[in-house]
Amino acid sequence: MEQFRGTTILSVRRNGKVVIGGDGQVSMGSTIMKANARKVRRLYNGKVIAGFAGGTADAFTLFERFESKLEKHSGNLTRAAVELAKDWRTDRILRRLEALLTVADSKASLIITGLGDVIEPEQSLMAIGSGGSFAQAAAKALLENTKLSARKIVEKALTIAADICIYTNQNFTIEELDSES
């Protein structure tokens, strides 16, 4: 069976805000199956925002697992991410899941992979998915050359990615939190 694929998720931290945004397109092969999927969500009573790229069902399973890790570790984002990554890598069922997660709270931003990696990005910027490199390049240029807010940077960079990547559309979901950095 052909895999659902493609998306763009982007996170930017700037001026006391952290923002994660993503597009809404779900593709299967060369067919758009859905244009308004919600790939960015609030977790842990709204204190954490998360986005996913990869298989939709896989991502929902990982969101549930991650939220239970947040509950278990009293909202400690890094600890919950490391515990999820360990489970994801070692559990026979979980390790078959194909997705990447971006997660952020007021203090940290992380990418979690099925290989057991928990990556803290440089320069307050992270992007995943088929259009991630386009969005990241656009956001980096906007961060370095404008005074735009984190939200505006995410909106503009996702728009640029959607203009380039065939697996990304302009139906965005954007979530924002106050940040300590």
UniProtKB/Swiss-Prot annotation:
GO cellular component: HslUV protease complex; proteasome core complex
InterPro entries: ATP-dep_Prtase_HsIV_su, Ntn_hydrolases_N, Proteasome_sua/b, Proteasome_suB-type
EC number(s) stated in the UniProt entry for this protein: 3.4.25.2
Keyword annotations of the record: Allosteric enzyme, Cytoplasm, Hydrolase, Metal-binding, Protease, Sodium, Threonine protease
Active site as annotated: 7
Gene Ontology terms, MF aspect: metal ion binding; threonine-type endopeptidase activity
Location(s), subcellular: Cytoplasm
Catalyses which reaction(s): ATP-dependent cleavage of peptide bonds with broad specificity
Top-level EC class as recorded in UniProt: hydrolase
Residues bound to Na(+): 162, 165, 168
Keyword Protease among record annotations: yes
Activity regulation, short description: Allosterically activated by HslU binding.
Top-rank taxon, per record: Bacteria
Keyword Transcription regulation in annotation: no
CDD domains: protease_HslV
Subunit composition and interactions: A double ring-shaped homohexamer of HslV is capped on each side by a ring-shaped HslU homohexamer. The assembly of the HslU/HslV complex is dependent on binding of ATP.
Family the UniProt entry places it in: Belongs to the peptidase T1B family. HslV subfamily.
Protein task: Protease subunit of a proteasome-like degradation complex believed to be a general protein degrading machinery.
The protein's name in its UniProt record: ATP-dependent protease subunit HslV
